[in-house]
Amino acid sequence: MLFEKKKMLSASNKFIQDIHDLPIEIKRNSIILIGPMGTGKSTIARILAKEGNRIPLDDTEFLKGLYAHQQEFHNYKNFEFGLVGTVLSTLKKTSVIDFGAGHSVYRDEKLRRQMQLMCAEFSNIILLLPSANKEESRQILLERRNIKLGSHKDQDNWHFITAPDNYELATHIIYEKGKTPKDVAEEIESLLRNKGSMEEER
């Protein structure tokens, strides 16, 4: 397990270098969606991507070539880290990438720091949350996913809501309460259009 972690940390240096070498347009225009379970990342990614390139990180069929290596890892978080690094460092064109809830959150401080470095060059990392109030977000997601309070899924999602990782990675936070997935997608598009206009004026 220790060797496996060291292997991932070593691989992350190559991921970071390969991401640095990606065309600037890919890093500037791609959209990464992060957030707890039940925030609609996949649905919103499909709307944003339209007919463009969408990469769903928790879709085992879509990424079956990468998921085929899952059994080689004793620690699933090391596999998730490697999956994220591989996908981000090999992007061929502007994409909409929806992370699974755990892909952006790591209890291991070294992996967490390396994830920050891997994501640092991407301009549009959108954290989706129901509400700015963490407890309200928890209650909304419990009802939305029909999850029992205190269950393992609830505990996992509470960790995803409260852990600092997502807040540190995000370039923007979108609160979804009272909005449809289409509303959220349009808000993201408007946000990025305005951001692009401001950058052009500089």
Give names to the regions the model predicted.
Residues 2-26, 47, 51, 124, ...:
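NTP-dependent small-molecule kinase module
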Residues 36:
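P-loop (Walker A) phosphate-binding loop of NTP-binding proteins
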Residues 33:
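Hydrophobic anchor at the beta1->P-loop junction of P-loop NTPases
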Residues 101-104, 131-133, 179:
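Short glycine-rich anion-binding loops that position phosphate/pyrophosphate groups of nucleotides
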Residues 77-120:
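Glycine-rich phosphate-binding loop used to anchor ATP phosphates in small-molecule kinases
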Residues 119-168, 172:
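A glycine- and Lys/Arg-enriched "phosphate-lid" helix/loop adjacent to the NTP-binding pocket
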Residues 46-89:
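Conserved substrate/cofactor phosphate-moiety recognition/catalytic segment
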Residues 41:
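Conserved lysine of the Walker
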